[in-house]
Amino acid sequence: MARICLHAYVGGRVQGVGFRQSTRDEAERLGLDGWVRNLEDGRVEVLWEGEEEQVKALQRWLERGPRRARVAGVEVEALPLQGIAGFIVRR
């Protein structure tokens, strides 16, 4: 299966609810590489890459988010592979 890279902006009640840490945990569980960070406008930005099936699984997870989050929308775009190793929470 091919490796792909996706980039997303997640809106709604997604800050102050453990969204970044939960995203990192889910990405690591799926064996993905990338990063997640809060934006000043209240959204969360995520970039991740890996095997297509796992990348799409994280995309579906982002549409729900962790239990305390209320996701209002996810804007996703495909990008070229970034060559990232590991998954981190950016500040």
Curated annotation (Swiss-Prot):
Tree of life domain: Bacteria
SUPFAM superfamilies: Acylphosphatase/BLUF domain-like
Catalytic activity of the protein: an acyl phosphate + H2O = a carboxylate + phosphate + H(+)
EC assignment: 3.6.1.7
Annotated active site: R20, N38
Keyword DNA damage: no
Annotated Acylphosphatase-like domain residues: 5-91
Gene3D superfamilies the record matches: 3.30.70.100
Enzyme superclass (EC): hydrolase
Pfam family, one: Acylphosphatase
Entry's Gene Ontology molecular function annotations: acylphosphatase activity
Keywords, alphabetical: Hydrolase
Disulfide bonds: none
InterPro entries named among the record's database cross-references: Acylphosphatase (IPR020456), Acylphosphatase-like_dom (IPR001792), Acylphosphatase-like_dom_sf (IPR036046), Acylphosphatase_CS (IPR017968)
Keyword Transport listed: no
Family membership: Belongs to the acylphosphatase family.
Protein name in the entry: Acylphosphatase
UniProt organism field: Pseudomonas paraeruginosa (strain DSM 24068 / PA7)
Name of the gene: acyP
